[in-house]
């Protein structure tokens, strides 16, 4: 995807796909950097917002993860995963505070 980004750096989906690959490789901060670019190009990219939530969970930035999922849910209210993930993150926070 790097080559595609070089050819068209304004194509948000290329950045999003590379962010996904980086996430799967465990390169969470690099993935976050690409997600930031996606959202700079297309602030309503709900897939990138959901991905940002996953990255923030891995980085243990739980409040940021919840905010990402809330934004995704606001943009795409019928998408079920943000609601589920928000609930799971809140439960995780609760368990860690015990």
What residues fall within each predicted segment?
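Register position in tetratricopeptide repeats
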Residues: 24, 58, 88-95
């Amino acid at each position: 995807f790097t080559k595609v980004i070089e050819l068209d750096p304004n194509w948000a989906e290329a950045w999003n796909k590379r962010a996904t690959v980086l996430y799967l490789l465990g390169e969470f901060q690099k993935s976050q950097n690409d997600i930031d670019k996606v959202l700079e190009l297309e602030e309503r990219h709900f897939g990138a917002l959901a991905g940002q939530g996953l990255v923030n969970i891995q980085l243990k930035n739980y409040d940021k993860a919840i905010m990402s999922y809330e934004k995704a849910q606001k943009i795409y209210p019928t998408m079920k995963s943000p609601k589920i993930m928000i609930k799971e993150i809140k439960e995780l926070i609760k368990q860690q505070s015990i």
